A protein has these predicted regions:
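C-terminal segments
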Residues: 2-15, 84-87, 248, 275-316, ...
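ALDH superfamily catalytic-core signature
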Residues: 4-6, 10, 125, 202-330
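Structural signal for hydrophobic packing residues in well-ordered secondary-structure cores
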Residues: 14, 18-25, 37-48, 57, ...
Length: 432
């Protein structure tokens, strides 16, 4: 095989993964699959490894911040391991005497995983754990900027595998620097594809001829109504919005605040570090450059964002995020979409019904099928919202980023990849 032939390199990598998987399955047991998954979990959760991976991710991608990536790597992996701990994935997993139906778990084969630069450590680790838990092998295709982090992660995984005598070829990544051509070939020759990231990659996966699990676009909108605990709502929104510099697809991109408590909520939001800007065009002119999000603003720390937006002399010291009043929704109003930054769009609604309609319009523009939220004390309103909006999840009185992808204080399963159902152009709405 010539190293000058990138397609042949991918095919050879998948061939090694397939041979390793077949041996893994032939000698398989629940204990073996579980130990392989546990080895990967420890490879990323070990404190020194976690810190190094977080630092490397921020250094090479320029996205997010180290403390929050450390938290994310640990929390998402620990939560996933809790969720799958007692799930049977080998042999007979159910034998129903009443129906005469026996269910047997069988591996799929080689999983191809496309992962984003926003989570170059946590997402591949979670994909790898899920693959091994079910007796599969996996080949990861990281974003170009995520390659160093993925390489380091695999190095830690291999060290754990060597201790257990597990074949390294069960977990591989596309060799060398990633490219569209290499990723496309991986999509074509894998047995199942898992895609987290850009909608372009999702579309390519769905047209590759290989079964695919993929995610939809996020653009979370959250209602704050007149019955809400305003202090708690502001604190939760601030914590969620700023976590890892808003790299999560579950980060609030817009809040819709009912008029009766609008001014009071703005005061509470300011106490939690949110500075309100009423000139939306000023933000638009800085946040987008030639139709694209400004790389100097996206996923940056607060001081970097504020400087990029030209607001250094216009916001209070200690400002953690920028809240921007606006009215428009749709393609001609960029603030109504996903911003991947500490910028939060603020809509003012006349009442709850108007807030629901505004949220519906936002989701129809972008983010349908993903998730919305509400801060309220009215027991009936979350259900009203759920029945009115094209969404797969309604998060109630919680910090959205922490709740949507799984939490230890709610029933959502842990994941970094949210299926968005047919509304979001996906096969399923499950947490992948």
């Amino acid at each position: 095989m010539s190293t000058d032939d990138p397609i042949a390199e991918v095919e050879a990598t998948v061939a090694r993964a397939r041979a390793a998987q077949q041996a893994f399955e032939a000698g398989g047991s629940q204990l073996l699959y579980d130990r392989a998954a546990q080895a990967v979990a420890w490879a990323i959760m070990e404190p020194d490894h976690n810190r190094i991976l977080a630092e490397l991710a921020v250094e090479t991608t320029g996205l997010g911040n180290v403390p929050d990536k450390i938290t994310k790597n640990h929390r998402k992996t620990l939560g996933l391991m809790r969720d799958i701990q007692h799930v049977p994935t080998y042999g007979v997993i159910k034998d129903d005497a009443d129906t005469g139906i026996t269910e047997i778990a069988r591996p799929i084969g080689v999983i191809g995983a496309v992962v984003p630069s926003t989570n170059p450590g946590a997402t591949p680790a979670n994909n790898i754990i899920n693959a091994l838990k079910c007796g599969n092998s996996i080949v990861v295709s990281p974003s170009p900027k995520g390659v160093p982090t993925c390489e380091a992660l695999l190095g830690y995984i291999y060290a754990e595998f060597d201790k257990l005598g597990i074949d390294r070829d069960l977990v591989q990544m596309i060799p060398g620097r990633g490219s569209k051509e290499k990723t496309q070939r991986l999509l074509e020759v894998s047995d199942l594809i898992v895609v987290t990231g850009s909608q372009n990659n999702v579309k390519r996966a769905y047209t590759s001829g290989t079964p695919a699990l993929a995610v939809g676009a996020g653009n979370v909108a959250v209602i704050v109504d007149e019955t809400a605990d305003l202090t708690a709502a502001a604190q939760k929104i601030a914590a969620s919005k700023t976590f890892d510099n808003a790299t999560s697809c579950s980060s609030e991109n817009a809040i819709v605040v009912v008029d009766a408590i609008y001014d009071a909520f703005v005061v509470e939001m300011a106490k939690s570090g949110g500075a309100l800007i009423t000139d939306d065009q000023r933000i638009i002119d800085k946040l987008w450059v030639k139709g694209h999000l400004n790389p100097c603003a996206i996923a940056r720390n607060a001081d970097e964002l504020i400087a990029a937006l030209g607001l250094t002399d216009d916001v209070p010291a200690g400002t953690q995020f920028i809240a921007v009043e606006t009215k428009g929704i749709g393609p001609d109003f960029p603030l109504s979409g996903e911003k991947l930054s500490r910028v939060l769009t603020v809509y003012r609604a006349s009442d709850f019904d108007d807030a629901v309609e505004t949220t519906r319009k936002i989701q129809l523009h972008q983010g349908a099928g993903h998730s919305v939220g509400i801060h309220t004390a009215a027991q009936d309103r979350p259900l009203t919202l759920a029945n009115a909006i094209p969404t797969s999840r309604v998060i109630v009185n919680q910090a959205h980023t922490f709740a949507t992808g799984g939490a230890f204080n709610n029933g959502m399963p842990f994941s970094l990849s949210m299926g968005c159902g047919s509304w979001g152009g996906n096969l399923s709405l499950i947490h992948i």
